[in-house]
């Protein structure tokens, strides 16, 4: 999973066509996190505007980062203070990549940093980012992803 601020994402000069995004200037730094299996998720729920004939999307990204440390704490604080864009990877035989929050960004909805009681309990962060978008998530090619700098 990768995150950057919405303003940094916009500086990539994103171009949208046929449900995909390409980057004109892939120089923005994304924070990249390798997540444990079966502990993170994303969804992009289409939501009709009742009788108004409108449709919008409510994206949500929830992820868990194991182990508390100062570097992660500082990054979580930076991301929490900004509107962000997330790029997520699916768990398929051939993974696909999706950018979420590309128009309005995602805001921190809930965040928890702490340790559990039992030896097997989480010692780390659980973060949920949510947004409100006019369009669904967009595909990111592996070629464009390769051009992104990861922090």
Task: Give residue ranges: language-model regions.
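Short, hydrophobic/proline-enriched secondary-structure or compact coil segments at domain edges
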Residues: 1-4, 61-63, 82-91
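Generic structural motif
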Residues: 6-9, 38, 66-70, 91-93, ...
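Oligomerization/assembly interface segments of phage tail-like spikes and tubes
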Residues: 49-70, 121-135
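Short acidic, glycine/tyrosine-flanked loop/strand segments centered on an H-E-D-like triad
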Residues: 60-64, 91-112
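Short, acidic/charged, Gly/Pro-enriched secondary-structure junctions
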Residues: 74-101
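Mixed-charge, glycine-accented linear interaction segment located at domain edges/termini
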Residues: 105-151
